[in-house]
């Protein structure tokens, strides 16, 4: 039987991994690249002078970290697009990686050799070399304005090598090297495709579970819900003006200019303060308390990683024969995505059919809502680290970004004392996700955490 095949897996060794992760939160404004770079170095200088500073292994920046985000036409963004191995974003990442001997991941607007434009994130290794470039797979409405292209590859994984960051459980120090499987998701990648795909497809997080991703890195420009996104309002001058006045008043109440806060830094460096768990029903999206995270969005981000969360009802799905149909009918990407328009999927299919592991790869490793044919919760007993770098500030007087950058650990555990009839919370109350710390919604700054987790080799 197919389900029995999974039990033929080889025995694996558990490694304990320790990484120092630094997240930078910025408020970049269009036309202010140099100023944003200057503030970045100012933040990094303050980070290194902290009494609790430790050298980071990874530094993650937001989506479009230096350029600003709200471009309304192709001609508006063209002065800021660059090739993947040149330009201000690459040069900054290269300098940071060489200085700190770490990986740097930064979001930027890309112009490829065929003059196609992408919303991308580049990865620079500790030697200052660009080793991976990811292009956003699911696009937000704003990107349509400047002819952004979908990533024809779809979601991807890539290896990240870390020196002396791992050990066996019976060893005292982290003296082993480890290669982690990583994946990047840029903002809208976390949401349903075009906001029209079924909510419970959880495309990106399902991809990560299916492919045993251990390190999930998300540069973002995610909005606070007080932003003006309603198309009827945006296309009605009187409604738009009233809505913009409301935002301006909210900013004034917080003592902020129309662009939001810049140059006032919130630093959470090396402490162990975790983000308090707040149920979805109690979280507010009001734009106040700039040094506190937007828990409404934090809870939503956690929900979008549902396949990583403990959920008791999975045992019932596992017993249901319709699970097989759901898994076998699952496509790699939504069928109207660019992935299916250039023949790439046909190449992938040929490669798959040539593999001796075709049954395991196509069936046993696939999940629906986190459930596979081999086990009710495929992620059970595993660990993964999620790092979200979101920008803050305001653009156009209409768009407020949610900030709240943070670091999370999915521990793969059923909550202690949980009974079979207990309901599973699908927000920050779910104990299978650990909130290792968040920045506030409205301030630039940095958060540095040492994260410890298990991987199997």
From Swiss-Prot:
<dbReference type="GO" id="GO:0036211">
    <property type="term" value="P:protein modification process"/>
</dbReference>
<dbReference type="GO" id="GO:0008418">
    <property type="term" value="F:protein-N-terminal asparagine amidohydrolase activity"/>
</dbReference>
<keyword id="KW-0378">Hydrolase</keyword>
<dbReference type="InterPro" id="IPR036526">
    <property type="entry name" value="C-N_Hydrolase_sf"/>
</dbReference>
<feature type="active site" description="Proton donor">
    <location>
        <position position="136"/>
    </location>
</feature>
<comment type="function">
    <text>Deamidates N-terminal Asn and Gln. Component of a targeting complex in the N-end rule pathway.</text>
</comment>
<dbReference type="GO" id="GO:0070773">
    <property type="term" value="F:protein-N-terminal glutamine amidohydrolase activity"/>
</dbReference>
<feature type="active site" description="Proton acceptor">
    <location>
        <position position="63"/>
    </location>
</feature>
<dbReference type="InterPro" id="IPR003010">
    <property type="entry name" value="C-N_Hydrolase"/>
</dbReference>
<dbReference type="GO" id="GO:0030163">
    <property type="term" value="P:protein catabolic process"/>
</dbReference>
<protein>
    <recommendedName>
        <fullName>Protein N-terminal amidase</fullName>
        <ecNumber>3.5.1.-</ecNumber>
    </recommendedName>
</protein>
<feature type="domain" description="CN hydrolase">
    <location>
        <begin position="19"/>
        <end position="453"/>
    </location>
</feature>
<dbReference type="InterPro" id="IPR039703">
    <property type="entry name" value="Nta1"/>
</dbReference>
<dbReference type="GO" id="GO:0005739">
    <property type="term" value="C:mitochondrion"/>
</dbReference>
<comment type="similarity">
    <text>Belongs to the carbon-nitrogen hydrolase superfamily.</text>
</comment>
<feature type="active site" description="Nucleophile">
    <location>
        <position position="187"/>
    </location>
</feature>
<dbReference type="Pfam" id="PF00795">
    <property type="entry name" value="CN_hydrolase"/>
</dbReference>
